């Protein structure tokens, strides 16, 4: 028989190169020659019909039979059949209008015999024995877009394993199996009456084409691993290609709707997809039985059910269907055994679960090693405190590489041994994981699901211990995540690491197996919901599995949250779905499935809530609400009935809080009135305390004892409180750091003689000669100041002597102008003109300097009283206050009427004006040293010392004062004669010891005259403070040190206190001094000691001493330690004592330094201490 086909590649008769398209012809010429013996040859009509069908488009009948689980012993070739549609296979169910074909024994069908003949010839041509054909798993590969797919054929357990499993069935399962067998026998009897040989041939032929296409797709992914296999006829490739093109168009139309529904209601998607898998599981065993018995009468009923819900399935979930292929007789093709629906479901379940486990376990015959294997392709994410596992999207190369690894014949036997245990364990793991997976569920459903999971866990601990080693966590769903990483997780901890070797084997068998398992639980719940109480627990585990494994991910990628699970043996409740699988007949199961589908499609969440609440007979643990209610002394029994598990936490908590008895509150009118009175009393007390704090009467301090208001403040204190405050009060302000100062300036008298508005250059009697002078004289008062500050006067008198009236006007304006900037600018102009006038060497006239009267008039106009300017009676100037006023009035006589009522020009201390006057005086005393007489210099020195006592000048560095004092002391002609007079005059400027110390420290000590004045002034002040007679101050330093030793002995604090007490008693009429006055006198005594010690330091440390004075300093050190240091008794409450003792230590250190720097006397190497005589 001649066959027309394309020539095969040399060297590779049947297998194309990897990556190439499958050849048009799948059988070589003469390929059947080796297998012709005992085989029936094909007729030319059959071959012609096959060629015609090759170029025809695939019919609907071909498409809906692609997933048919028909048995086939043919090995197909081909390579990488790409599916670019929805990445899956979906059945197109047959129309319910088709008549049921008559069942005919398969061995009598001519088409099947011709097809089987060609296949056997094809296998014998390549020398591959049928027994060595790999057993393909019952699973489908869920692929990413654009990847390849293979649809492996099915396998079933050996007869021995099946009989072994039947031995362990419970009585309930045997009973259900018996009912199923009876129902199936009735279906077969009804099917015989509707037989039609012509329709039977059509249906059988369509089944063969569908099964061939599925097997072809499965073998195409295995072509790279089995290059010796030859391809089959191109008819089945064309059918599969046309199916894929149609699925591509359908996917594009449904993609947007599926993504929106998937993102909005993932729970509904999961539920609907589980229902879809349930329909497939219900349909596939019946297809197997129809293949064995040719026709099953109940086919149209199941097709009606599937067609009725097909549109709703597609709208609520992504189009992913786990496909199953093959039958139980895949390994034994010569045996055709008729089984009941329950037997087929049982065998399919037993053969599927081990293969699902084999996808994440290494294929080893040794059982113990399988426990330590792990799931792969899991990506870890931690969005919260829950571990999140996601499946990484597979690469196209990974799909085909993992196909051959999971198809070894030995896997069937190894996996079948653990089928029942693995099924239950996967249900338990899926139940716990799914309840943590759905974050969109209501809070009540999440809590109920968690409680049910704990109940299942408790029930598992009571079952057999043979299954307690491992609870394998199945791979849940593939999530395309490019950035995910592989995470190893042990099965016992729900940790599922993978080796890199098994990276390509992930989701094909697991997704299909667990989805089908979930469907079986759902069917069982629909059939035996009211009969068996254990079914509800199976419902609980099956429902989450449906939503967990049946949720496909496109966009956004679905994620799985996994909580650590504890391995425990499977509970009997987990076996309930499998044990009750055979109960009921097929018609009753079909009607129950319809009702269940309708109920689930109406409301998925209500269905889940009903499933969770249906477990009433199961032993339950204490709920969280019951434990929390114990805090309120309340139990669920007290409320009448426990809250339903489906209610949320809010409703449960509100139920329990409603039974808590509130406390009794007696709010009477008397209590309200009492509270108001207490509030008013507290408000008044708070106001009183705030007022006392504001007035400084918050704490009664003994510091103010002796003051006028101290007695009033302490009248309200008890005696014991007074004693307590007096005992523990701390006095820290007895010795201030700064001198108290005096009020020298009276700002109300400022501007009494003149101000910036009355000073006019035109009233000075000046007659202008130059153009600039005439311009200034023609200008007003404001313009005169402007021209002066802009440099007109400086340029006018650059080469000419400046007239005295102009200089005097500038000096007065500088001292009285309220704008400090203008005052500084006038000072600059005045100093520049004065310096320029001094450069004229040919001029016989000295530059102008202000006279003592001009200086006194300026300070008097600032607000200083005339008696303060010249405080000493024996040192008075030649003028008086009236002269200053009259002189100024003559210069401003014309404007006196206009400014008869003057106002103070200064409200604060004019420190800028004061310093400007002092600076100009310093310049004048430097340029013209002989400008002042000695008497005038002494009056100026006393004036400066008095002005420095101003309180507001304490914080201002008086460097300009010291500079002027140096010039004035330098200009004194008879210095030695004037020093004692100057010291006695300064000593009279103040009566306060600290002010006098300030005057001593104001004297500059960096000149010889300054140090001398400082020493003499210190001795004079010390003698005054110690009430000694004023003696002539010796000029020699040796005599001064000797006098100092005599004064130092009298500086004992106790002696000073006695003198003060005696003086105070003399002033008191009764001569009695209380303790408070004694404390004040003690403070004054230590304060005086502090000042005296500073003055002693100024006397001794002002300049360097010779070796002849060394013995005097040795005496001073001994007197200081003996009379002062030893007399001070420090106290923590009396800080002033510590302050005085610290000063004693510093002075002693300085004297020791002077002693060390002085050389010993002539002829002595060492100094020895000589006791006082």
From Swiss-Prot:
Provide this UniProt record's keywords sorted from A to Z. Disease variant, DNA damage, DNA repair, Nucleus, Phosphoprotein
Q: Does the keyword Disulfide bond apply?
A: no
The keyword Nucleus appears for this protein: yes
| Outcome of swapping residue 271 to C | Found in a patient with neurodevelopmental disorder with hypotonia, dysmorphic facies and skin abnormalities; uncertain significance
Q: Which residue windows does the record flag with biased composition (Polar residues)?
A: 317-330, 409-428
Sorted alphabetically, the Gene Ontology cellular component annotations on this record are: chromatin; chromosome, telomeric region; intracellular membrane-bounded organelle; nucleoplasm; nucleus; PML body; site of double-strand break; Smc5-Smc6 complex
Q: Which GO biological process entries does UniProt record here?
A: chromatin looping; DNA damage response; double-strand break repair via homologous recombination; positive regulation of double-strand break repair; positive regulation of maintenance of mitotic sister chromatid cohesion; positive regulation of protein-containing complex assembly; protein localization to site of double-strand break; protein sumoylation
Bias type Low complexity, positions = 212-221, 262-275, 571-592
Note down the stretches annotated as region NSE6-like domain. Answer: 664-1166
An MF annotation (GO) of this entry:
protein-containing complex binding
The record's annotation in InterPro entries points to: CANIN_dom, FAM178
Please give the superkingdom of this protein's source.
Answer: Eukaryota
Q: Which family does it belong to?
A: Belongs to the FAM178 family.
Role, per record: Plays a role in the DNA damage response (DDR) pathway by regulating postreplication repair of UV-damaged DNA and genomic stability maintenance. The SLF1-SLF2 complex acts to link RAD18 with the SMC5-SMC6 complex at replication-coupled interstrand cross-links (ICL) and DNA double-strand breaks (DSBs) sites on chromatin during DNA repair in response to stalled replication forks. Promotes the recruitment of the SMC5-SMC6 complex to DNA lesions. Plays a role in SMC5-SMC6 complex recruitment for viral restriction.
Disease entry from the Swiss-Prot or TrEMBL record? Atelis syndrome 1: A form of Atelis syndrome, an autosomal recessive neurodevelopmental disorder characterized by mild to severe developmental delay, learning difficulties, microcephaly, and growth restriction with short stature. Additional features include anemia, skin hyperpigmentation, ocular anomalies, congenital heart defects, and mild skeletal abnormalities. Death in childhood may occur. Patient cells show spontaneous chromosome breakage and chromosomal anomalies, hallmarked by segmented and dicentric chromosomes and mosaic variegated hyperploidy.
| Known partners and oligomeric status | Forms a heterodimer with SIMC1. Interacts with SLF1 (via N-terminus); this interaction links RAD18 to the SMC5-SMC6 complex. Interacts with RAD18; this interaction is increased in a SLF1-dependent manner. Interacts with SMC5 and SMC6.
Could you share any additional remarks the record makes about this protein? Localized in the locus associated with inherited infantile onset spinocerebellar ataxia (IOSCA). No mutation were found associated with IOSCA compared to control subjects. The expression level in the brain was not different between the 2 populations.
Its protein name is SMC5-SMC6 complex localization factor protein 2
Q: Which gene encodes it?
A: SLF2
């Amino acid at each position: 028989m001649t066959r027309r086909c394309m020539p095969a590649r040399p060297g590779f008769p049947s297998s194309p190169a990897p990556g190439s398209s499958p050849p048009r012809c799948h059988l070589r010429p003469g390929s059947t020659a080796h297998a012709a013996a005992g085989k029936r040859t094909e007729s030319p009509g059959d071959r012609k019909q096959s060629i015609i069908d090759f170029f025809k488009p695939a019919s609907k009948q071909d498409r809906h039979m692609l997933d048919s689980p028909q048995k086939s012993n043919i090995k197909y070739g081909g390579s990488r059949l790409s599916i670019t549609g929805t990445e899956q296979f979906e059945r197109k169910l047959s129309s319910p209008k088709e008549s049921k074909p008559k069942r005919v024994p398969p061995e009598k069908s001519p088409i099947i015999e011709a097809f089987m003949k060609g296949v056997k010839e094809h296998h014998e041509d390549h020398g591959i024995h049928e027994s060595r054909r790999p057993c393909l798993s019952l699973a489908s590969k869920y692929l990413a877009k654009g990847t390849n797919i293979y649809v492996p054929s099915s396998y079933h357990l050996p007869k021995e394993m099946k009989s072994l499993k039947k031995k362990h069935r419970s009585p309930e399962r045997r009973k259900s199996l018996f009912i199923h067998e009876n129902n199936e026998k009735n279906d077969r009897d009804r099917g015989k009456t509707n037989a039609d040989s012509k329709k039977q041939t059509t249906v059988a032929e369509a089944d063969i084409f569908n099964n061939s296409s599925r097997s072809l797709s499965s073998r195409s992914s295995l072509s790279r691993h089995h290059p010796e296999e030859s391809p089959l006829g191109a008819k089945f490739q064309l059918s599969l290609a046309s199916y894929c093109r149609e699925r591509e168009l359908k996917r594009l139309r449904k993609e947007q709707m599926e993504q929106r529904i998937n993102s909005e209601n993932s729970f509904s998607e999961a539920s609907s997809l589980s229902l879809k898998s349930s329909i497939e599981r219900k349909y596939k065993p019946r297809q197997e039985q129809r293949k064995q018995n040719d026709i099953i009468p109940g086919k149209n009923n199941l097709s009606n059910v599937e067609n009725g819900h097909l549109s709703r399935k597609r709208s609520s979930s992504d189009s992913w269907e786990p496909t199953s292929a093959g039958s139980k007789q895949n390994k034994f093709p010569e045996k055709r055994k008729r089984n009941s629906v329950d037997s087929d479901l049982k065998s399919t379940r037993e053969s599927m679960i081990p293969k699902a486990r084999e996808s994440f376990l290494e294929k080893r015959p040794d059982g113990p090693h399988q426990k330590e294997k792990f799931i792969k392709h899991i990506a870890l994410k931690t969005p919260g405190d829950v571990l999140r596992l996601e499946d990484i999207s597979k690469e196209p190369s990974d799909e085909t590489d993992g196909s051959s690894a999971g198809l070894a014949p030995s896997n069937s036997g190894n996996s079948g041994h653990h089928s029942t245990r693995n099924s239950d364990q996967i249900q338990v793991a899926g139940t716990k994981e799914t309840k943590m997976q759905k974050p969109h569920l209501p809070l009540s459903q999440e809590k109920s699901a968690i409680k049910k999971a704990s109940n299942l866990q408790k029930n598992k601990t009571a079952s057999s211990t043979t299954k307690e080693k491992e609870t394998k966590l199945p791979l849940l769903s593939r999530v395309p995540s490019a950035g995910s990483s592989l995470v190893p997780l042990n099965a016992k901890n729900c940790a599922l690491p993978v080796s890199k070797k098994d990276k390509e084997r992930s989701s094909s068998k697991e997704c299909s197996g667990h989805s089908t398992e979930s469907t079986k639980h759902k069917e069982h719940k629909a059939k035996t919901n009211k009969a068996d109480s254990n079914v509800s627990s199976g419902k609980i585990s099956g429902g989450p599995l449906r939503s967990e494994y049946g949720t496909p991910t496109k966009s956004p990628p679905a994620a799985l949250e996994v909580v650590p699970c504890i391995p425990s043996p499977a509970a009997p409740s987990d076996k309930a779905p499998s044990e009750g699988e055979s109960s009921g007949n097929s018609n009753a199961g079909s009607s129950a499935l319809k009702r269940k589908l309708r109920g689930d499609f109406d409301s998925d969440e209500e269905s889940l809530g009903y499933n969770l609440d249906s477990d009433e007979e199961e032993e339950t643990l204490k709920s969280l609400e019951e434990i929390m209610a114990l805090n309120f002394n309340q139990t669920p029994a007290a409320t009448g009935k426990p809250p339903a598990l489906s209610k949320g936490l809010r409703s449960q908590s509100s139920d329990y809080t409603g039974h808590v008895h509130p406390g009794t509150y007696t709010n009477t009118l008397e209590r309200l009135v009492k509270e108001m009175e207490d509030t008013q009393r507290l408000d008044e007390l708070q106001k009183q305390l705030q007022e006392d704090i504001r007035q400084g009467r918050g704490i009664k301090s003994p510091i103010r004892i002796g003051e006028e208001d101290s007695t009033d403040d302490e009248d309200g204190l008890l005696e014991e409180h007074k004693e307590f405050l007096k005992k523990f009060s701390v006095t820290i302000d007895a010795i201030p750091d700064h001198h108290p100062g005096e009020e020298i300036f009276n700002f109300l008298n400022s501007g009494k003689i003149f101000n910036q508005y009355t000073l006019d250059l035109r009233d000075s009697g000046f007659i202008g000669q130059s153009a600039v002078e005439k311009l200034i004289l023609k200008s007003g008062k404001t313009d005169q100041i402007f021209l002066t500050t802009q440099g007109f006067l400086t340029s006018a008198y650059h080469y000419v002597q400046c007239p005295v009236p102009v200089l005097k006007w500038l000096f007065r304006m500088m001292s009285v102008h309220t704008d400090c900037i203008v005052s500084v600018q006038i000072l600059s102009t005045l100093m520049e003109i004065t310096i320029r006038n001094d450069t004229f060497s040919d001029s016989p006239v000295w530059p102008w300097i202000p006279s003592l009267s001009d200086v006194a008039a300026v300070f008097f106009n600032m607000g200083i009283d005339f008696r303060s300017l010249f405080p000493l009676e024996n040192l008075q100037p030649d003028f008086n206050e009236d002269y200053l006023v009259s002189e100024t009035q003559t210069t401003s006589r014309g404007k006196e009427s206009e400014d008869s009522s003057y106002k103070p020009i200064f409200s604060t201390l004019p420190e800028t004006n004061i310093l400007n006057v002092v600076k100009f005086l310093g310049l004048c005393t430097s340029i013209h040293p002989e400008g002042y007489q000695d008497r005038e210099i002494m009056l100026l020195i006393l004036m400066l010392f008095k002005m420095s006592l101003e309180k507001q000048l304490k914080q201002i560095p008086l460097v300009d004062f010291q500079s002027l004092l140096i010039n004035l002391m330098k200009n004194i002609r008879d210095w030695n004669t004037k020093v004692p007079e100057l010291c006695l005059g300064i000593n009279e400027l103040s009566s306060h010891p600290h002010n006098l110390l300030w005057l001593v420290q104001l004297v500059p000590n960096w000149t010889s005259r300054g140090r001398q004045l400082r020493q003499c002034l210190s001795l004079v002040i010390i003698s005054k403070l110690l009430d000694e007679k004023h003696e002539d101050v010796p000029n020699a330093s040796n005599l001064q040190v000797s006098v100092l030793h005599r004064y130092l002995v009298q500086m004992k604090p106790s002696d000073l206190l006695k003198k003060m007490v005696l003086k105070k008693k003399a002033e008191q009429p009764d001569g009695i001094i209380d303790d408070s006055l004694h404390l004040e006198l003690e403070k004054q005594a230590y304060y005086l000691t502090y000042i005296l010690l500073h003055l002693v330091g100024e006397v001794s440390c002002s300049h360097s001493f010779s070796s002849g004075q060394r013995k005097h300093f040795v005496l001073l050190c001994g007197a200081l330690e003996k009379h002062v240091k030893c007399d001070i008794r420090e106290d923590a409450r009396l800080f002033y004592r510590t302050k005085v003792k610290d000063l004693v230590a510093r002075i002693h250190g300085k004297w020791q330094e002077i002693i060390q720097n002085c050389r010993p006397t002539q002829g002595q190497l060492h100094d020895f201490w000589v006791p006082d005589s």
